Amino acid sequence: MMCDLLLGAMIPLSINTIISDGEWKFGDIGCTISGFAITAANCAANWALCLVSVERYLAILYPFNHSVYVQYVKYISIVLWFFVLAHNSVMLHYDDAFILIEDMYMCGPNIRSYPLYIVLLNLFDLVLPNIIIVYTYIKIHKEVQRHNREIAVNTLRSTSTKGDDLDMNSSTEWKAALVIIAIVGVFNVCWIPFGVGMLAYAL
């Protein structure tokens, strides 16, 4: 939610730049603030999605402890933002860290001057969350499969119902797999091209 609000607050600046034929009218400080806010919000959004996948996995693995996890959501969110702001604030020590990206009508990291930063940013805020998301949803799918097998063993009473119940379990597993594929797919479609483009431009 905070990520979306932060990104939304920066949209008027880009609109003004488009209207002004690509001229940035908010000064160097405005560009730094805007570039930092957009970068931090994108990173926080990736990690938030990652934490959601971990929370879902824990909820399935330990259903009776789910209420305990919910109580700590606020504190986890604070730690998340502290982590994101801490490693993104490194660039604030450099005057030319954020510049106007003319093709996008917005301010962002100075990719050409600080390629190492872009590489590390992609590793920490794109690759690592993606690995965790893929891993947790694969584990979720395996847990659903195991759970369905246990239900099948405990509920099958006769040969006549066995086939129907197994078909139902297979259908449930397939639907769970589709959800996993959709979530991971959307994440990758949204962020991998952006990350690859930044890396290619930096190198």
Where are these predicted regions, by residue range?
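Internal alpha-helical transmembrane segments of multi-pass membrane proteins, especially GPCRs
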Residues: 1, 42, 74, 78, ...
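Structural signature of the GPCR N-terminal helical module
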Residues: 1-30, 36-37, 43-61, 79, ...
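Hydrophobic alpha-helical segments of membrane proteins
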Residues: 5, 9-12, 86-89, 93, ...
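Loop architecture of class A 7-transmembrane GPCRs
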Residues: 18-35, 39-40, 62, 68, ...
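Helix-loop boundary elements of multi-pass alpha-helical membrane proteins
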Residues: 54-75, 145, 167-176
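Intracellular effector-coupling site of seven-transmembrane GPCRs
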Residues: 142-194
